Amino acid sequence: MDISSKESHTPDSGEGKGEAASGGRDVVRRALGWCWTGKVSDAWCFAIGYLLALPFFLAPLFATRLLPGLDLPFHLAAADMLSKVGLPDSPYAPYYEGGLRIAPYAAHFIALVGLGKVMGLLAAHKLIVMVYVAGMPLAMASLLAACRRSRIPALLAFPLAYNLTLHYGFISFALSLPVVLWLLAEMTKLVHAETRRAFVLRWIGTAAVAILLFICHLQNFLYGVCASLAFAVLSVASWRRKLVASLALVPAFAGLAYWHLTSPPVVGQAKLTAKLAWTFLKRHRLDDLGAAKWTDDLWHRILLIPAHAMRGFVDGSHVPACRGLFLIMVAYVLVGMIAWSAPGEKKEPRPLRRRRMRMAGLVAFLGALAAYLALPHHLQEMELMTFFPRFSVLVLLMFLLLVPSGLLRLRGLFVVALPLPALVFGALYGQQLYRHYKAYGAEIAGFVAVAEKTPPGGKALGLVFDRRSSVMQVESTLIGIPSFYPALRPAKGSMVPPNYCGLRHMPCRLKVPAEFATSPWLPLSFAPAAMLPTFDYFFVRSQPPTFDPFRGYHGMVELVAQSGLWAVYRKKPGPIVSDPPPPRPAPVPAPAAIVAPAPVAPPPTPSKPVRALRGKKR
């Protein structure tokens, strides 16, 4: 009997292992051959790199229950107010009025209120930020592909999603960044649409994205429409098509005009005009310049881009990270220039379209750089704080448009290796983000602990005396933490005063004087006699030993919980009554008068007998 075939497959023979190893080598050889033939597309490499990098940049969002952001708690408080507009028992009704409308900043509030109907505000905001982080490189890749560029550099948009605007709580500005990229991509695809049907559909899509950008943020809307017009004008399409494509921006401009004409001016200020805005901008920019030379000031701002773009952490780790990110961008530029001389097919009209889009990308980059260099740091009259630094993110995003299209000429293993620098950087920086976000979560764990022990349904006020963070490099980043109370303890009666109500871009206005609630910026001005009739809970952080917030009313409050530097006090039920005056001390009897003892006369000195004296005299 021939059993050789059976023996060849026995484990002891070792031949099965050899065949498996040979099969594995064949698979690797075929894969390498497939890569070397140039069949690996740029889109395929980007998709694989995107899926590999995505978990590293979503993980930080789950490292802390409350995401960092200076203004974020105030926005969530405003969203809580909007969700209760029209309710007869709304705790905000006696003090605030407002509602959703066509205006900048509205997109974030619309998303929060809509998602808040099926989930909590904290979960809704975290979902929005997840979409934002995941969408940034996708929008960048769409723009690069529309400009006939490689999509792979778009992987560098992942770390740029964690930028200054996100950590400062400028959520609307941050959310508008991928929408700017999306608008430029849609405008480019619109002017180059090949069929009438595709042009009509693209026109509707571009108009919708422009409206979305307007209700996200005003500054990026103005930049985005100017950049998209440059992309339309510099395209290879006819002037008639360029004009019709540009008309897709008209609905968004109509929304801008409606908002500007129907919004009342800020209390105490004249109605904003172009001349007045220019006056404010010029004055504050010259104040920033001071006695320095223009060349020194501009160069100093350029050197500050790494400190501004990805700003977030006290240890300054974001600065070398941003420099490393920029070096990878420069490396992609150099590789693209070198690969440009490689042999490849030239098809019309792609070379002309690539040259035109390269010019459009340069215009977009220079526009973002001009905004960063020309705008002032603060523009209080127009409700703009930390103004020019926020455009540093846009400068780096637009720099990706300068990467030559020569990357598309790479073939074989070069294409597979192209995403590796971005992936390695993303993995390292993603882990760093996770550690910092986890440390921030530990820092605010004391507030979460006392908030969870605070009953829902009350009106709360925060008194943060030390608002500095040991993790986040953002001024006063902890000042708004008490405003998370309605999101952490949701109920019909839960309320905190939404800050910034009354500003033109905010969806709420005060019906009473602002002094009805102590400003979070002035905790030392807290007056218990004025605040106790309105508020039920008081979150206090780092109370100074020399300041007694409940002076004269200690009998009206009681400690609910304390954890770390945080404490929460509850107002006792009943009428507000001040502490009784301290009992008068018992009168101290006057000390008895001390009478000096009468002097005692010394005993008389005995004298000699007279007779004796006389006898002697004789």
Explain the meaning of each model-derived region:
Residues 189-211, 241-247:
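Short hydrophobic alpha-helices at membrane interfaces in multi-pass membrane enzymes
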Residues 405-431:
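Signature aromatic-anchored transmembrane alpha helix within multi-pass, membrane-resident enzymes
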Residues 28, 140-162:
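Transmembrane-helix signature of polytopic, membrane-embedded enzymes
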Residues 450-543:
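Short periplasmic/luminal acceptor-recognition loop of GT-C membrane glycosyltransferases, typified by
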Residues 77-84, 96-121:
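Short hydrophobic/aromatic helix or loop-helix immediately within or flanking a transmembrane segment
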Residues 127-147:
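Transmembrane-helix motifs of polytopic, lipid-linked glycan transferases
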Residues 168-176:
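Short acidic/glycine- and proline-prone juxtamembrane loop motifs at membrane-interface regions
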Residues 64-74, 86-89, 96-97, 210-363, ...:
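Transmembrane catalytic cores of multi-pass membrane glycosyltransferases
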